């Protein structure tokens, strides 16, 4: 792994989000999340890309004076256009290592609308939280119902005993930014 600098000791929120779509509402949401994290004096840790929602969240955080830590696997440096403007850019060997660094660095997690990679990150951190590997807040910020199908399926799994109610309670699903940030706040 390589890094540009040392991160200040601040509350850190990992944001999991998309690396491909450029829907205006998604980019606006990601930008609002980045700006709000910075406004609170928190550090943003994200997937290290400078495209789609990843680029919007990090650019907005920096534009509002926030500290940004990008974590990107070597194989995606060019595909996701690594954000070399990050205050710290960690280049990992593998996707697994990327997720581990993000999880280790974060005090809380916010998931925005995204695809397979975003789901992978969410499910991984949720599973680890449920298993007691951490007690960090896991927030899904879903203002447009992007995750409604997933939530319905998970509810069915809980109803049939495949997912415990305790596991379901670990997920904090909100539809507005203020509630997401409140759920991530220290203390």
From Swiss-Prot:
GO terms for cellular component: cytosol. Coiled coil: none annotated. The keyword Hydrolase applies. One of its GO terms (biological process) is cytokinin biosynthetic process. Pfam families: Lysine_decarbox. SUPFAM superfamilies: MCP/YpsA-like. Its EC number is 3.2.2.n1. It is an enzyme of class 3 (hydrolase). One of its GO terms (molecular function) is nucleotide binding. The keyword Hydrolase applies. It catalyses: N(6)-(dimethylallyl)adenosine 5'-phosphate + H2O = N(6)-dimethylallyladenine + D-ribose 5-phosphate; 9-ribosyl-trans-zeatin 5'-phosphate + H2O = trans-zeatin + D-ribose 5-phosphate. Keywords: Cytokinin biosynthesis, Hydrolase, Nucleotide-binding. PANTHER family: LOG FAMILY PROTEIN YJL055W. Belongs to the LOG family. Catalyzes the hydrolytic removal of ribose 5'-monophosphate from nitrogen N6-modified adenosines, the final step of bioactive cytokinin synthesis. This is Cytokinin riboside 5'-monophosphate phosphoribohydrolase. It comes from Mycobacterium marinum (strain ATCC BAA-535 / M).
